[in-house]
Amino acid sequence: MSEKNKQNDIKVIATNRKAYHDYFIEETIEAGIELKGTEVKSVRLGHVNLKDSFARVENGEVFLYNMHISPYEKGNIFNVDPMRDRKLLLHKHEINRLAGYVQQKGYTLIPLKIYIKRGKIKVELAVAKGKKLYDKREAIAKRDAELEIRKKMKEYLR
């Protein structure tokens, strides 16, 4: 692999699969994340949980809440609170666009995945709208129907 391709590789650390089940994803955006030293080491080891995490725009800045980063085993006194609020790094125009979305009723910001890109830890943030119970049932029924069709086609082609 060439040096150029090696730098553009993306290594996914954690994904929020529940987000696709609970929300309609409208738009995604890549954001940097402000971490402490031992948090970076812990993230690189994959000790991250995105379940129930969300982001909020406050005073022209975006913060990520409820993201759990397990304390680094060898970090001793340098470890920080695993559930602390973390600042996301975005351009001002991106923050303004996200703030406009979030002010609309029903929209929220949720992290979809954390990955390493060119040595930097990034978060894929989504503007999402919550699904109602009947929407979830509808999605499950549609997925089951597609699965049934694939099975029948496979049977037919044998």
Curated annotation (Swiss-Prot):
GO MF term (any one): RNA binding
Cellular location(s): Cytoplasm
UniProt superkingdom: Bacteria
Predominant cellular place of this UniProt entry's protein: cytoplasm
Keywords tagged on the record: Cytoplasm, RNA-binding
One BP annotation, GO: trans-translation
Pfam families the record matches: SmpB (PF01668)
InterPro entries xrefs: SmpB, SsrA-bd_prot, SsrA-bd_prot_CS
Single GO cellular component term: cytosol
Function: Required for rescue of stalled ribosomes mediated by trans-translation. Binds to transfer-messenger RNA (tmRNA), required for stable association of tmRNA with ribosomes. tmRNA and SmpB together mimic tRNA shape, replacing the anticodon stem-loop with SmpB. tmRNA is encoded by the ssrA gene; the 2 termini fold to resemble tRNA(Ala) and it encodes a 'tag peptide', a short internal open reading frame. During trans-translation Ala-aminoacylated tmRNA acts like a tRNA, entering the A-site of stalled ribosomes, displacing the stalled mRNA.
Stated family: Belongs to the SmpB family.
NCBIfam families reported for this sequence: PRK05422.1, smpB
Protein name: SsrA-binding protein
Species of provenance: Caldicellulosiruptor bescii (strain ATCC BAA-1888 / DSM 6725 / KCTC 15123 / Z-1320)
